[in-house]
UniProtKB/Swiss-Prot annotation:
The gene is ohgt. Residues 452-561 form the CULT domain. The lineage of its organism: Eukaryota, Metazoa, Ecdysozoa, Arthropoda, Hexapoda. It comes from Drosophila simulans. One of its GO terms (molecular function) is metal ion binding. This is Protein cereblon. The keyword Zinc applies. Substrate recognition component of a DCX (DDB1-CUL4-X-box) E3 protein ligase complex that mediates the ubiquitination and subsequent proteasomal degradation of target proteins. Has an essential role in mediating growth by negatively regulating insulin signaling. It also has a role in maintaining presynaptic function in the neuromuscular junction synapses of third-instar larvae. Likely a component of a DCX (DDB1-CUL4-X-box) protein ligase complex. May interact with pic/DDB1.
């Protein structure tokens, strides 16, 4: 009897185990079908036509005007912001301090064949989510499986291999067809005359016409130490730059340093100090030269950077705040004025006696120089290498296309002016700021004359525009600081055009608080990561040229060499956006 009961119990347990195995098999099959559906949707999103050759392509303002067309980009949709950006916090994105985080990749034809359009990617994710909700455990159970993550990684890497293979095949075909020809260059930009008063942006007239002039400029003695109010700034300012800002008027007292305009210090946390002085902050002194009431409890100020300073962090009293974020607490510190050493050209120390009268005669200048060289032991190449005049002439030739006619003659001011208008890399900007020698600063600048540089998105590293397309819409140069209605300060770089398919648009165009009178502004976003990178400016008044240009925000772009250029850099973008969409649907 006991044997019969045990046999019946064993048979029941066996049937239960079979049912459990069958349920597990069905569950695993459902998971495999869901992953297969994702992979099929992923593969369906891949077009079969070959990728076009990787060349520079641009939004040409002349072509837009000639064709009479409007901006071709569609309005972008909201997506999550990039929490892996290099900046700690995403800055204000437009002139009204709204923060768009949007993108529209529905234009499939504008993408390379290896990159998955976001609308198809979203459809695939939505299908996976809807199927996963019909089973026990939901999406969390699906994502917990190693099989799913392995399949996702496999799909992503397969697209990367396909992209690399396509690029190699394209390069080989181009090399076979044109073995002796150089690589394709960017299309030349037709010369455009500036039909705009470049004095208007420099006056910051968007603040209004009620500003009062504050006379006087005070230069402090080199090496002296002064106690003054200090702020932080997210951009590096060089002496000579104008810093407009909006702040509570109670932050400044009448008894602060300055014979006429108030003097305060601005330091740059992004400027890494030398290794031997890790507890130092570097910055500049700024002096207010115009101010006026805004009517909202804040005061508009226009200030100019004067001298470089260094601050010992141990001397700071209080918590320093960013000047662009409406600071409410005062912070004081002792600051030391840094020197500017300039050595004249070597040949100027050679006394030629009565022959010196020929030095200033243009027709005799070259002969006089050769005669000077014959009396010294220095080779002519060495003298030419350190000649201030040769550096100025080469810089003038490089900046000729930017239509800048305000190049200073003072070597000290010129060295800072060239840094702002030649757009050096962040590493080079740091070196030029920290050096006390004007000659060394000019030599560092000269070493960059042969480099071709581009603007890259600071968030996803995609290329946006060529630095050779910079031009001056302000008499101060191609790079100028502007302030929006909320007090946020934007470092803006003006370019004729941007690389095609590199940008999208957000919001509606507006003429309110325009930094360039007669132009409307429209927010532009990076096409890959949907982060704010600047504005498009389009003329709304007749007889203004250029009709269209772009302003790139310094906090959203970085300068890099042309060797870093890649037509598309979307692998990280694809993975990040897919995982963020899955995460958002799980919440």
């Amino acid at each position: 009897m006991d044997e019969e009961e045990n046999s019946e119990i064993n048979s029941v347990q066996a049937r239960n185990e079979d049912v459990q195995l069958e349920d597990q098999s069905q569950s695993q099959g459902l998971q495999d079908r869901q992953v297969d559906a994702i992979e099929q949707a992923w593969n369906d999103a891949m077009p079969d036509e070959p990728s076009p050759p990787a060349e520079y392509a641009f939004h040409d303002p002349l072509a837009i005007v000639g064709e009479g067309g409007d901006a071709p980009e569609a309005m972008v949709e909201d997506v999550l912001q990039d929490d892996t950006a290099s900046e700690g916090s995403h800055p204000s994105s437009d002139m009204s301090l709204e923060s768009p985080g949007s993108e529209d990749d529905s234009d499939v034809q504008g993408l390379p064949n290896w990159m998955i359009p976001q609308n198809r990617l979203r459809s695939a994710v939505d299908m996976m989510v809807s199927q996963a909700r019909n089973r026990d455990g939901g999406i969390a159970a699906l994502l917990s499986g190693d099989n799913f993550l392995q399949r996702v990684r496999s799909m992503v890497f397969s697209q990367e291999r396909r992209r690399s293979r396509t690029s190699e095949e394209t390069s080989q075909e181009e090399a076979a067809e044109e073995p002796d020809d150089p690589p394709p260059q960017q299309p030349p930009l037709p010369p455009i005359d500036i039909g705009f008063d470049t004095n208007l942006p420099a006056e910051h007239s968007y603040f209004g016409n009620h500003l009062s002039r504050v006379p006087g400029v005070d230069y402090l003695e080199v090496g002296s130490v002064h106690h003054m109010l200090i702020f932080l700034h997210h951009h590096i300012l060089f002496p000579g730059e104008v810093l407009p800002f909006m702040i509570d008027g109670q932050m400044f007292d009448d008894d602060m340093p300055g014979l006429d305009g108030l003097i305060f210090g601005v330091s740059f946390p992004r400027l890494q100090p030398p290794e031997d002085n890790p507890h130092k902050l570097y910055g500049v002194t700024c002096q207010i030269y115009e101010r006026g009431e805004s009517g909202r409890g804040l005061v508009f100020y226009k200030s100019r950077a004067l001298q470089r300073i260094v601050i010992n962090c141990d001397d700071i009293k209080g918590s320093p705040q960013y000047i662009a974020r409406n600071p409410t607490n005062k912070c004081f510190s002792n600051v030391k004025i840094l020197p500017e050493y300039f050595l004249p050209e070597p040949l100027q120390s050679v006394d030629m006696g009565s022959m010196a009268r020929f030095r200033d005669i243009p027709s005799m200048r070259d002969k006089y120089r050769r005669f000077q060289l014959s009396t010294t032991t220095w080779p002519s190449d060495a003298c030419q290498e350190y000649s201030f005049g040769s550096i100025v002439e080469r810089a003038r030739q490089r900046l000729e296309s930017q239509k800048i006619d305000t190049m200073p003659k003072c070597p000290i001011q010129l060295s800072f002016w060239l840094v702002r208008n030649l757009h050096l890399t962040e590493k080079m900007m740091r070196l030029t700021f920290l050096t006390d020698s004007v000659n060394t600063r000019l030599q560092l600048i000269k070493s960059t004359f042969k480099d071709e540089t581009l603007f890259f998105c600071r968030y996803c590293n995609s290329s946006l525009a060529l630095c050779s397309d910079l031009f001056a819409m302000s008499k101060h140069g191609v790079q100028t600081q502007y302030c929006n209605p909320e007090g946020y300060i934007h470092e803006t770089n003006t370019v004729y055009r941007v690389i095609s398919h590199a940008i999208g648009y957000s919001g509606e165009p507006s003429t309110k608080f325009s930094w360039f009178p007669g132009y409307q502004w429209h927010i532009i976003l990076c096409k890959f990561c949907a982060q704010h990178v600047g504005w498009e400016f389009k003329a709304v008044l007749p007889n203004l040229t250029p009709n269209v240009f772009f302003g790139l925000s310094g906090s959203s772009v970085r300068i890099g060499k042309a060797s870093e250029y890649s037509p598309f850099n979307g692998t990280t973008y694809v993975v990040r956006n897919m995982l963020r969409m899955i995460s958002s649907d799980m919440e």
